[in-house]
Amino acid sequence: MPGKAANRFAPIVAALQWDRGRWIWLLIILLLLGGVLGLGDSISALFRYDRSAIAAGGWWRLLTAHIVHLDAHHLILNELGLVLVWALFAQDYPAEEWCAIVFSGALAISSGLWWLSPHVSWYVGASGVLHTVMAAGTANHLATRAWDRWILLLGLCAKLAWEQWGGHPTPLVVVDAHLYGAGCGFAVGGALSWRTAIIRRRSA
């Protein structure tokens, strides 16, 4: 019995183990996000998703919108979210695949806002990309049959549904960005997990 209990909680212990390289990268990202906020409102105005500015040629905003924040409170909330998803999912994909997931998520969110949410005139923040990361991690947990896979899937889907049906308390949160980010995360994460499974079968 003790052995079975230890095996049951092994994934939790593994997820929270100190991996110096991964956590150093997390610290660097947190500091960079804070540094961007410290550059002031002029940088935020230059980097944010701004529909009229993008139409005038400011295409870089499609990517940079996801690294600027409204204020310190907004930044701290997103950084806490980043720490949580890092602890849960950092080991699910190699670094190059995570870069592809994040890049794809940023583009998918901005494209979704442009084509599907024309009422959104501006947007800033990393929360949409965090939903990409959560969905990609959940896709991997589903593919690997991790013990928490259904908890993660139901929790994320319930959150997205709650937001889409008017559950979020503040209109400043662009919930469409969360939906587009999660959709991209499930698609890209699912594709990567499927590819990895095929490679493992062929090499077995």
Identify the function of each model-found stretch.
Residues A65-A87:
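Di-metal (Zn2+ and/or Mg2+/Mn2+) metal-binding site signature of metallo-dependent hydrolases
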Residues W25-G38, L82-A136, I151-W162:
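Small-polar-interrupted transmembrane alpha-helices in polytopic inner-membrane proteins
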